[in-house]
Structure formats: C-alpha cells, structure tokens
Amino acid sequence: MKNRKSKAGNKLNILFTCIGRRVSLLESFRRAARRLKINASFLGTDTTELSPALQLCDRQFGVKPTTHPGYIKQLLSIVKANKVTLLIPTVDLDLKSLSQNKPKFAALGCHVLVSDPAVIDICQDKRKTYKFLHKNNFDTPATASIRTALKNSKSSIVNSKSETRFPLFLKPWDGYAGRGNAVVNNRRELLFYARRIPNPICQELVKGIEYTCDVYVDFGMKVRCVVPRKRIEVRAGEVSKGQVAKNRRIMNEAVTLVEKLGAGPGVITLQLFLTGDDKLKYIEINPRFGGGAPLSIKAGADFPKWILQELTGGKPNIRFDGFKDGLIMLRYDSEVWLGASQ
C-alpha cells in the first residue's frame, strides 16, 4: 500500500460505512487526527439521514442497502468523487462485499480496512467458525445442526440416550449483533425456536465470565496489541457496561488465534467465555471494530492513532500491553439535534 502523506491542503478523506450510532468511534478518529496534526475529513454512509453518527460526519452520503446489487458501485463512486484514502466498515453487513472488491477500491487509491474474503467467510458462517476453532485446537462450544442435536446420538451435545442436554443455545449461523439468539430449555422449545430462527444452529450453553478482545493487526499483518474486556452488561448485542481486564493468558492465546486465521489489518474482535473450570471457550470472531472498542481506546490502545500513523507512512510505537487495566465504561444515550423550521 502506498503511503498517504497529509500536508496542508492535502487532506485525508476517511469514509465510514454503515456508520449508524458509532459516534464515539468517529470522535476517536477526529481526536487522533488532531493530535497527529493530520488534516483529515471524515465521511459517512448510511441508508437513512436519521443516523446520529452520520449527522456528525463532515460529509454525509445516503446509500442503498448493503444487499442491493448497486451498493459497491455507489461506494466506489463516493470514493472516487471525494478522493477517499481509507474506508472503515463498522458492521458485519458489508464486510463480504467490501473484501471481495478491495482491488477496485485500491485502484482508486483507497485502502479498505477489511480482511481477505476467506477470513470473512470463516467469521460470518458460524459453522465454519466452529470448524476453524476446533481444527486449530481452540476450545469452543460444541455445535451441531438442529437435526443432529435431536437425532444423532453421537453428537457431542446429546447423551447416549439421544436426549438433548438442555439448556441449549440457538442462533443463526449467519447472524450478527445477537439477533435471533435464544436459550431453549426443553425439546418443545427447541422445536419452537428452530422454526422461527432463520438458518439455526445449536450449541451447548456456556456459562462463565464473558470477554471481548480487541486485537490490533498492523498493516504488515502482525498482531501488535490485545485488549481483553469483560462484558458486564449487553444491550441489543453491544456492550453497555464493560471493564478492561489484562489477562495474559487470554492476550497470548488471542495472538495465536488471529495469526492462524490470517485476519487483518485493523481491529479484530474476539468473543469468549472463561468458564468455571478455567477453560477459554471462543464463541465469535468479528473482523471489524467492535461496539465496545471505545473502552480499549480510552484505556490507551489508541487504534485510530495507530491506523492514521500507518496510513501516512509512520511507524506507531505500540506496546503489546500498554493500556490501563481495570478501566470501566458505563454507557448512556445522548442526542443529536437537527434543524427545525422557524
């Protein structure tokens, strides 16, 4: 990737897609640009103008849904017209299409902060996530199809009498943001939710302390920092209360996992449980900024600063464990006000 030098009159234009509610992430990049004395403009896209983070961008663009066949063409047009040098996805919805079309963006001088298609495929298909983790000896909840859970006595989540061990956890194999997840306590509930959850898979229900890890992979594809944080409280699939927890075992294992996966560059988000019998069980891999990334940034893992430094040819000074342990984040809602007629 060519270095993008930021000089007076040579502004870096950075585009966030599906920006939605990511106000804190946007402002983190703004602060980083100011500290680095980088002349930067921040652009955003969304399907609706009534998007709080979109309204706080320097330039706003309404776009088609990510599933629309013209979505990528529209983004390419925005990138070309505005000389965008960096594109940052913020949700799962367009990761696959952005990854598949990276060469088209690169031809316009735009670096897309997204992993390769094979990595996206593993992360966005939870059946493949399970196979990857299992094959590489990372502990993960036993996973099976609904049919296997009900009928196959050899399944690791049913006993020798072919009776499912309840409770179980159901979720779509292609789901995101906790949508469609359900805990089932008996066979009747299993059948009920299996008919209502799209593309369901069945997993053992894991209990323990839930963690998210923000893993920073530099532009040379090397893991440079891992920040584990406890998920104290979650709302709509996104952490609302969290605490940084400098657990060396989790940090070191996260490095191995992300390197074997080949994810990056940028921030890769891992979700896992530390169980009562001291096992680390991984449940999700999201190759993008997680909703709780502002906690890690505030603790000292300044991902926006590092990204901007690398983008402009710098070499950020990154300490693997250079962040504050124990920092707690408590989130609340705020408002964005739009103009009203007199």
Where are these regions (language model features)?
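Short catalytic-loop micro-motif centered on adjacent basic/acidic residues
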Residues: 15-16, 86-89, 142, 201-204, ...
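Active-site nucleotide/adenylate-binding loops and adjacent lid/helix of ATP-dependent enzymes
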Residues: 119-209, 219-220, 248-252
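Short, charged, surface-exposed secondary-structure boundary motifs
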Residues: 70-74, 115, 121-125, 180, ...
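Conserved protein kinase catalytic/activation segment
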Residues: 278-280
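Peripheral (often C-terminal) accessory segments that flank ATP-dependent C-N-forming ligase machineries
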Residues: 1, 156, 275, 305-342
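ATP-binding N-terminal substructure of ATP-dependent carboxylate-amine bond-forming enzymes
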Residues: 1-113, 158
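ATP-dependent carboxylate/phosphate-activation module, predominantly the ATP-grasp catalytic core
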Residues: 179-188, 194, 203-263, 267, ...
